[in-house]
């Protein structure tokens, strides 16, 4: 939403503003670009999040829930909710959607709470991967605690959106020559009077910078840095696959968040340092317009990074399109039959290889007229003297937890 700073006093009636500050060429170009980008995000990201969310819900219903899949489902839900209210905000910013005060406040609550929970969920996913790898023994977190964390996250998101709802209202815009305020258009905006700029507005911008910008970057970088260092100690095959995934995930997030945090910090500075003149008010609107696009871009790339990059999730999506995930019993029966067939083929292949090896060994023994003893070679770190060595404990636990982390990061 646009943020309007008006050099007047606050009253209970809808404010009327005569736009004496003409829109500059750069501001018009940036606002037009914002509208085009938001339209693209709505028409591409909306269906994409809907498909991913439906696939994840059906997969959870068929295969069961886990802590990562619960977080993934919440992430797709918040992104879809944000993109659901975004068209109304875009139309309002373009002066194409008249609305009342109550509907504007409702849209503000949904928008700011869903964006807040979306950023928090991304940080929670990173924290959960750190928890899995950091613990010596992998202990699954109970579903009750997971749901409690998400409940508290949504509660915090709603509390965070309260200031936005309080200061969201309908503003009637009029031309500078319309002294009687007869012709105009209404928009949903965050409305602040001049005396609230250095107190309420500054506090809101600083809070937004911390919650939407700095905190997710710090948590993602910290937790995935530990994840990255742990992956390097595993086997080469597991390392190359997971390192690529984590690198793409982290680089994409930081590439979007770094300019966003910089813009928000500069916007907070401009709020307090710049005077209330047309030139500076226009620059503030330009900076705010640039910063507004970043949360919407996250809603577009999150399903791509967390779902579509995973081979397992793509397989589930194909099964969803074929209708295989609609019947849980039929799907589980089909999976069981496939596993049984695979095990039968594997056993048959092993038996054939064993017979061939036995015949070849007997032939060599017959030709060489020599007896060969059978030795049982234990791999390093196996049972010795009735006890298992520590090297096996280290070599099995970390790859096992890493495998769980990689599949859980893929959203399945």
Swiss-Prot record:
All ranges on the Intravirion side of the membrane: 55-70, 130-138, 225-240, 306-412
Virion surface side: 1-29, 96-102, 161-203, 268-281
CDD domains listed in its UniProt record: 7tm_classA_rhodopsin-like
Family matches, as InterPro entries: CCR1-9-like (IPR050119), GPCR_Rhodpsn (IPR000276), GPCR_Rhodpsn_7TM (IPR017452)
Segments of this protein annotated with the region Disordered: 377-412
GO cellular component, one term: host cell cytoplasm
Compartment(s) of residence: Virion; Host cell membrane; Host cytoplasm
S-S bridge residues: 104-188
Residues spanning the membrane: 30-54, 71-95, 103-129, 139-160, 204-224, 241-267, 282-305
Pfam families, per the entry: 7tm_1
UniProt superkingdom: Viruses
Polar residues biased stretches: 388-397
Protein's membrane topology: Multi-pass membrane protein
A molecular function (GO) term: G protein-coupled receptor activity
Function: G-protein-coupled receptor (vGPCR) that constitutively activates multiple oncogenic signaling pathways including STAT3, AP-1, phospholipase C, NF-kappa-B or cAMP-responsive element (CRE) pathways. Plays an important role in viral reactivation from latency through activation of host CREB1, facilitating its recruitment to the viral major immediate early (MIE) genes. In turn, expression of the MIE-driven genes such as UL123 are de-repressed. Also facilitates virus dissemination via the extracellular and cell-to-cell route.
Family label: Belongs to the G-protein coupled receptor 1 family.
Quaternary structure, from the entry: Heterodimerizes with US28.
Protein name per the record: G-protein coupled receptor homolog UL33
Gene: UL33
